[in-house]
Structure formats: structure tokens, C-alpha cells
From Swiss-Prot:
Gene Ontology annotations of biological process type: cell differentiation; gamete generation; germ cell development; male meiosis I; male meiotic nuclear division; piRNA processing; spermatogenesis; transposable element silencing by piRNA-mediated DNA methylation
Motif stretch (DEAD box): 444-447
Protein's UniProt name: Probable ATP-dependent RNA helicase DDX4
Keyword Hydrolase (UniProt): yes
Region Disordered, annotated ranges: 1-241, 702-722
Record function comment: ATP-dependent RNA helicase required during spermatogenesis to repress transposable elements and preventing their mobilization, which is essential for the germline integrity. Acts via the piRNA metabolic process, which mediates the repression of transposable elements during meiosis by forming complexes composed of piRNAs and Piwi proteins and governs the methylation and subsequent repression of transposons. Involved in the secondary piRNAs metabolic process, the production of piRNAs in fetal male germ cells through a ping-pong amplification cycle.
Gene3D superfamilies, A to Z: P-loop containing nucleotide triphosphate hydrolases (3.40.50.300)
SUPFAM superfamilies hit by this protein: P-loop containing nucleoside triphosphate hydrolases
UniProt binding sites for ATP: 330-337
Compositional bias of kind Gly residues: 150-162
CDD domains: DEADc_DDX4 (cd18052), SF2_C_DEAD (cd18787)
Organism per entry: Sus scrofa (Pig)
Residue numbers spanned by region Interaction with RANBP9: 226-245
Annotated localization: Cytoplasm; Cytoplasm, Perinuclear region
């Protein structure tokens, strides 16, 4: 028997053939290398030359590894279609067509006569369903009666075995479900609400080993909201299906109330100046007792180790309790999360809650939105801590996890919803929550939430049906940086009489962080980093780079040099991101190489060092990065590599940040700052502009120079924030 005699090699009476690929031929849940195969024009040729080509290669007529060419349905009715291992099948991409085959035979690895094939319709066989390994589905039709399986060796959207002969239409979802011997029976077609339209999908990853494994996101006959362009939630609507379900956090009381140890400089917070602008601001409080919180909240505050208010808490808590809108700007690690959670919980405990697990539609009273998955999960853990033992239930939803898991968490009862923008809009689009009861809308890292990355999503949110107007809800914004442009954008979200709280130097770095700048060329950075890390030893260190590829490259390099390192960035699966943070948090890997996805809000204990391997493009991002150390009165150190060829635009704002934080400024940096003309100290095309006071005062003192943070990030290197 010849090597290429495929038909004779397969015995239809034995168990299904499961091919074994080399380890690197399969990339897990993200699909495999076959799914990314692009076909040449000859591979997509249905004519005789195309067939002869593949017969010479050992494949039977009309088979290829390439992609099935896209065409209109009338071109498909009398022709066989080039597919994967058989007609109508493919390991690669397939174009847009309704896949109707009126004539011709579509065989897989073997032929099988059947009485079910009537009217010259095609049975679909092959490796994956679009046919299982043995049989495909009986009927194929456009619209909702699409073939039931679209699958794989393992049965994703179909299966390896026999496809269903009589697919069943799901009347609720407008989908036809097809089974398989090992099939999942999951829907193959999606209804957009009228029951007649098939939601076509194409592109990479449909069919092949392990199959599509995608999740169909549709509306319910109403508007279906799309997620943000930065890619955080796009996996819910295209590409491989997200199946990851994060493990639940520990439920024991000791784990819930595990808290950050305050540092030696915590008492210095009392000396920080605070400015409140706006009319009729309530007076600040000095102790938690003055807030008149309920006993349960006071007990939880004590268990969490809170004994003294930070400046942002002294001013923000009474303002929120008074029902005023607030924009608060305070340095990193100064307790902003507790500043808005405690008064919101106090109101809920006093006024009662509306959402419960016994209601069909959950209507949370509070929505908290943050730009990154890690930050929103951190806020949720704080909300769970302070609401312990109360009737208030906090829920967290974010991208990179199974959508069904998010929905299940919500339907069990949701009073406080912590979410990333993309997943939040998906849940709203699916009408899994109602917005009519919203009393509090909180934007954490608000400058990032309102810039060009997330601004459109936030505008969609406040214009959603049922969302109370800004006059009927309380809107709160918190961040360490509030550029002038962001303050102007915020007026669309806040009442006109909102209060502005500025704690210390707005946009300035924490003085508990010792900053050092080293002049290092691009090609000398790796060796310098290695030298520093070897001197540091096992002290916990975060290394920031600008691109996702470089994060993995540097992490691999350090591991090769026997330094335990992990990485986190937007291209890593959520499971991998959480594993990396866990390894770093618990000391398994003392070095974490990260991109901007980890720059904001992350509160990891005992981070002693931050190294800017690449300086960011904006000075406010620099402030957020170095704010991962020196938190809650603890001291830390930040080292930045300054490249003369790429970082000159940061010289002037960097000098200003160092000076304001009472740090030593290197002579070479001052020379660059004052010899380089950047129209930004007088208005720049690069850099950042901070407002040290409320912009409603008519004028503001600029702390640093540069370009507005509303500038769009580099689309090549931008993070998948959500």
C-alpha cells in the first residue's frame, strides 16, 4: 500500500482516527497553525488544474489545506467547493458563503453510501464537523437551519463522530444545534433577533484541529453593544471562545481581611496640603467615627487594619455622603478605593438595597468601571471586604473570562458591579442587568477612562436606555493624574456643581519613591538591567517595557540568566495573567516584566523596586508606573533608563516631576531639558499637561509640559486593557 493511498489506509470499522501532531503544531485554546494557513490562488481553484494539482500531491479532488474561497450562493449550487481534507471542508480559513451544495459529492476520509442523501444534497464528512470524522449533517440551509456543527477533532461545535441527522432549532436563541459523537451540541448559527438571519462569521480559526471554539454574541432583537476597539472584549464576539473561569477568591475571614502594612512614612500624609474647589463643600472629617458609619462597617474597617484616615479619605468621604459629584486627584497608593467604597456602602446600608437573587432582572445600585482586569478585580476584593456580613453583594466581571460565568455571577444578586468597559457593555447589550436603579457611577483611573481609549465606551454607557441622567445619579471620578483636557471631558458626566479635591501635587510622583535616572543606550539596556537585578537580589521588582513582544523577550532573557521572572501584558490569556500576578505576589518569581496593563492601580505588597526599561511616551504614565512602589507610607525605589535617541521629549517634564518630589536631578538631564526646545512647556506635540488646580478657576498652573494624554496611543503597541 502506497504512502499516499489515504482511502485504503482508513478502516471505517475501527475507532475514529485521531491524528497526532507535533507539540509545536498546536497552540492550545487559541487554535493551531493550520488555522492560520493562507492559500495560494491555485489552492482555491475549483477548475481541473486545481484538482490535478492536489491529485498529484496525494489528495483527492477538491481537497486542500488552504482556505475555501468566498463566493455568492449562486456560484455554489452546481460546483464542489475546495475545502480541507474533503469537499466543503478546510483546515484553514473559509470565506463568506452560504455553503449550499446542490450537486456533487463531498467526501471526507472515506465515502459512505446512504439513503439519507436525497435530491443530490451533499453529505459533509471530514475531520471536523462541517462533517464529523464519520458523518456530517443531513441538511444544509442558509438562515437559521445552518449545519449544526462547525467543529474539530475534539468536538467543538460538532465533534469527531457522527453529526446530527436532524438538527434542532433552538427557538429561544434562533440557533440550530448540532451534535456529534463527542460533540458539544453548542449552537452553530446565531440569530440576530428575527429568527431568520444567520449571523455569518469568517476569518481565522474556523475548523481545523480543536475547531472554532468560539462564542457567538448577539443581541436579543435590540441594540447589541460592541466592545471597545482596544481589544479587551473583542474575544467575546470573534476569534476563539473564551472558556476560562477564574477560581473564586478565598472565603475565610482571615483571607478576606488580609491587609497592607502601612510604612514608616504613613503619618507624613497629615502634612500633605489638600485643596477643595467648588461651592458649599462639606467640611473634612478627622476620624472614621465622625463619618457616622453603621457598626458593621466600622467593624470591617477595623478588621481591615484601617485606623487612620488618609487625606483623600478625609475630604472625599463627607463629600460623597453629602450626595455631591466628585473629581478627586491624589497620589498613588493613598487609599482612593476606600474613599469611595465606604460612603457608598454607608448609603446602601442606610437606604436599603433593591437587587436580590430572587429578582429576574438584576438592577445594581452602583457601577464601578476601571480600565484593566487586574485593577477591577482588586476593587472587587476591597468591596467584598468592606461589605462582609452585610446584605450588599459585590460582583466583578471582566474580559478574558467565560461570558456565561459573568452572567451567572450577576443573576445570583448584584448590588455593586465592578467591571471593565468591554464586558460591561456586553452584559448591558444582552439585557442581563437593568440600569434604572443606578445611584452611583464610579470611574477609577478616570483620566484613562475618558481619553481616546475608553471615552467612546463611557459615552455609550451614560446614553444606554434606562441609565439615569447625571442630574439623577452621583458620579465619582478618581485618579492620580487629571490633565486639563480630561477635566473638560468630565463635564459631560458630572453635575455642574461638582467638587474638585486635589491632594498634594496633582500629577506629581509620591515622595516616598526614591527616583534615579540613568543614561543608557538602547543596546546597553539588557546588560544594565541584569547588573541591577543581580545587585538587588530577591527583592520584588517590576520592570516596565513599552511593547508586549519585548515583555516576553526580556522575561525570557532574565530566566536564561537564572533570574526567576514572569511577564504580564495584554496578549497573554487571562489565566496566564492571573498566574503571573500570583507568582509575583507570592514570591515565586520576584521579577515581573510588564507593559502598561500593570501600570495603573495594582496594589501589590512589598514591591521594592520599579525599573523603567523603556520610558513611557507620557509623563503621567511615568507617575503611575513608579507608583507601584512606595505605597501606604512604605518606601521604594524607581530607576529609569533614559535613551537620548528616544526620550528627549520627556526631559523637561521629568525634571519637573523630580523637582516637585524633592529628588536629585542629574546634571545631564537638566542640560538636555534646557537645551532641547519642546514647545510644550509652552505647548508641545509630545508630553503631558497637568492642571494643578480645578480648571473651572479660569487658569491653571502647569506642573509639567508635553502633549495631552488624550492623544491616541500607538495602535501597534497599545495594550488590550480590558
Amino acid at each position: 500500500m502506497g504512502d499516499e493511498d489515504w482511502e485504503a489506509e482508513i478502516n471505517p470499522h475501527v475507532s475514529s482516527y485521531v491524528p497526532i501532531f507535533e507539540k509545536d503544531g498546536y497552540s492550545g485554546e487559541n487554535g493551531d497553525k493550520f488555522n492560520r494557513t493562507t492559500a495560494s490562488s491555485s489552492e482555491m481553484d475549483d477548475g481541473p488544474s486545481g484538482r490535478d494539482h492536489f491529485m498529484k500531491s496525494g489528495f483527492t479532488s477538491g481537497r486542500s489545506y488552504g482556505k475555501r474561497d468566498a463566493g455568492e450562493s449562486n456560484k455554489r449550487e452546481n460546483t464542489s467547493t475546495t475545502g480541507g481534507f474533503g469537499v466543503g471542508k478546510s483546515f484553514g480559513n473559509r470565506g463568506f458563503s452560504n455553503n449550499r451544495f446542490e450537486d456533487g459529492d463531498s467526501s471526507g476520509f472515506w465515502r459512505e453510501s446512504t439513503n439519507d442523501c436525497e435530491d443530490n444534497t451533499t453529505r459533509n464528512r471530514g475531520f471536523s464537523k462541517r462533517g464529523g470524522s464519520r458523518d456530517g449533517n443531513k441538511s444544509e440551509a442558509s438562515g437559521p437551519f445552518r449545519r449544526g456543527g462547525r467543529g474539530s477533532f475534539r468536538g467543538c461545535r460538532g465533534g469527531f463522530g457522527l453529526g446530527s441527522q436532524n438538527s434542532e432549532l433552538d427557538p429561544d436563541q434562533g440557533m440550530q444545534r448540532g451534535g456529534g459523537l463527542f460533540g458539544s451540541g453548542r449552537p452553530a448559527a446565531s440569530d440576530t433577533g428575527n429568527g431568520d438571519t444567520y449571523q455569518s462569521r469568517s476569518g481565522r480559526g474556523r475548523g481545523g484541529y480543536k475547531g472554532l471554539n468560539e462564542e457567538v454574541v448577539t443581541g436579543s432583537g435590540k441594540n447589541s453593544w460592541k466592545s471597545e476597539a482596544e481589544g479587551g472584549e473583542s474575544s467575546d464576539t470573534q476569534g476563539p471562545k473564551v472558556t476560562y473561569i477564574p477560581p473564586p477568591p478565598p472565603e475565610d475571614e482571615d483571607s478576606i481581611f488580609a491587609h497592607y502594612q502601612t510604612g514608616i512614612n504613613f503619618d507624613k500624609y497629615d502634612t500633605i496640603l489638600v485643596e477643595v474647589s467648588g461651592h458649599d463643600a462639606p467640611p473634612a472629617i478627622l476620624t472614621f467615627e465622625e463619618a457616622n458609619l453603621c457598626q458593621t462597617l466600622n467593624n470591617n474597617i477595623a478588621k481591615a487594619g484601617y485606623t487612620k484616615l488618609t487625606p483623600v479619605q478625609k475630604y472625599s468621604i463627607p463629600i460623597i455622603l453629602a450626595g455631591r459629584d466628585l473629581m478627586a486627584c491624589a497620589q498613588t497608593g493613598s487609599g482612593k478605593t476606600a474613599a469611595f467604597l465606604l460612603p457608598i456602602l454607608a448609603h446602601m446600608m442606610h437606604d436599603g438595597i433593591t437587587a436580590s437573587r430572587f429578582k429576574e432582572l438584576q438592577e445594581p445600585e452602583c457601577i464601578i468601571v476601571a480600565p484593566t482586569r487586574e485593577l477591577v478585580n482588586q476593587i472587587y476584593l476591597e468591596a467584598r471586604k468592606f461589605s462582609f456580613g452585610t446584605c450588599v453583594r459585590a460582583v466583578v466581571i471582566y474580559g478574558g473570562t467565560q461570558l456565561g460565568h459573568s452572567i451567572r455571577q450577576i443573576v445570583q444578586g448584584c448590588n455593586i458591579l465592578c467591571a471593565t468597559p468591554g464586558r460591561l457593555m456586553d452584559i448591558i447589550g444582552k439585557e442581563k442587568i437593568g440600569l434604572k436603579q443606578i445611584k452611583y457611577l464610579v470611574l477609577d483611573e478616570a483620566d484613562r477612562m475618558l481619553d481616546m481609549g475608553f471615552g467612546p465606551e463611557m459615552k455609550k454607557l451614560i446614553s444606554c436606555p434606562g441609565m439615569p441622567s447625571k442630574e439623577q445619579r452621583q458620579t465619582l471620578m478618581f485618579s492620580a493624574t487629571f490633565p486639563e483636557e480630561i477635566q473638560r471631558l468630565a463635564a459631560e458626566f458630572l453635575k455642574s456643581n461638582y467638587l474638585f479635591v486635589a491632594v498634594g501635587q496633582v500629577g506629581g510622583a509620591c515622595r516616598d519613591v526614591q527616583q534615579a535616572d540613568l543614561q543608557v543606550g538602547q543596546y546597553s539596556k539588557r546588560e544594565k538591567l541584569l547588573e541591577i537585578l543581580r545587585n538587588i537580589g530577591d527583592e520584588r521588582t517590576m520592570v516596565f517595557v513599552e511593547t508586549k513582544k519585548k515583555a516576553d523577550f526580556i522575561a525570557t532573557f532574565l530566566c536564561q540568566e537564572k533570574i526567576s521572572t514572569t511577564s504580564i501584558h495584554g496578549d497573554r490569556e487571562q489565566r496566564e495573567r492571573e498566574q503571573a500576578l500570583g507568582d509575583f505576589r507570592f514570591g515565586k518569581c520576584p521579577v515581573l516584566v510588564a507593559t502598561s496593563v500593570a501600570a495603573r492601580g495594582l496594589d501589590i505588597e512589598n514591591v521594592q523596586h520599579v525599573i523603567n526599561f523603556d520610558l513611557p511616551s507620557t509623563i503621567d504614565e511615568y507617575v503611575h508606573r513608579i507608583g507601584r512602589t512606595g505605597r501606604c507610607g512604605n518606601t521604594g525605589r524607581a530607576i529609569s533608563f533614559f535613551d537620548l535617541e528616544s526620550d528627549n521629549h520627556l526631559a523637561q517634564p521629568l525634571v519637573k516631576v523630580l523637582t516637585d518630589a524633592q529628588q536629585d536631578v542629574p546634571a545631564w538631564l537638566e542640560e538636555i531639558a534646557f537645551s532641547t526646545y519642546i514647545p510644550g512647556f509652552s505647548g508641545s506635540t509630545r508630553g503631558n499637561v497637568f492642571a494643578s488646580v480645578d480648571t473651572r478657576k479660569g487658569k491653571s498652573t502647569l506642573n509639567t509640559a508635553g502633549f495631552s494624554s488624550s492623544q491616541a496611543p500607538n495602535p501597534v503597541d497599545d495594550e488590550s486593557w480590558d
